[in-house]
């Protein structure tokens, strides 16, 4: 039988990753006028596959920290600009705004899926059993 954590882990991992991506994209937009700022992003699909391979590692013994230190953080990449600016800044507002908007919609969709799963699970837990 799946635990609630396993039941919700894909959506919660996606929500966390989308939140991290929102912060990165917001930073890009905020630094659009900063000379030599390099636009950054993460590859959501690659990072989700990494999370699925790693799974949810629980720490219930002090020696488990050595294993956790080997887990790499999200790989942040630099975005290649279509039209490089003269000051070395690689932020292209149209691209960043489009990526941010798309990510926000996907974040909200993931949040809705997670909310629905929790609601359905709660309903199943509170239904009276027959017999």
Enumerate the predicted regions with their spans.
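Amphipathic, heptad-repeat alpha-helical segments used for oligomerization and assembly
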Residues: 5-15, 75-113
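Charged, well-structured alpha/beta interaction segments
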Residues: 9-44
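Extreme N-terminal "leader" segments
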Residues: 16, 24-27, 49, 53-58, ...
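Long, charge-enriched, surface-exposed interaction segments in small proteins/subunits
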Residues: 45-46, 50-83
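Structured functional modules or segments
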Residues: 115-118, 125
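Conserved small/polar residues in nucleotide/adenosyl-binding loops
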Residues: 123-129
């Amino acid at each position: 039988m799946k635990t609630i954590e396993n039941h919700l882990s894909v959506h919660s991992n996606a929500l966390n990753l989308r939140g991290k991506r929102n912060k990165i994209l917001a930073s890009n937009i905020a630094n659009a006028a900063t000379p030599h700022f390099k636009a950054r992003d993460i590859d959501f699909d690659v990072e989700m596959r990494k999370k699925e391979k790693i799974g949810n590692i629980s720490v219930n013994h002090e020696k488990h920290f050595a294993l956790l230190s080997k887990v790499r953080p999200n790989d942040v990449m630099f975005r290649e600009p279509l039209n490089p600016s003269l000051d070395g800044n690689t932020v292209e507002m149209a691209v960043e705004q489009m990526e941010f908007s798309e990510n926000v919609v996907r974040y909200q969709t993931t949040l809705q899926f997670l909310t629905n799963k929790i609601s359905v699970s709660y309903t199943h837990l509170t239904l009276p059993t027959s017999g």
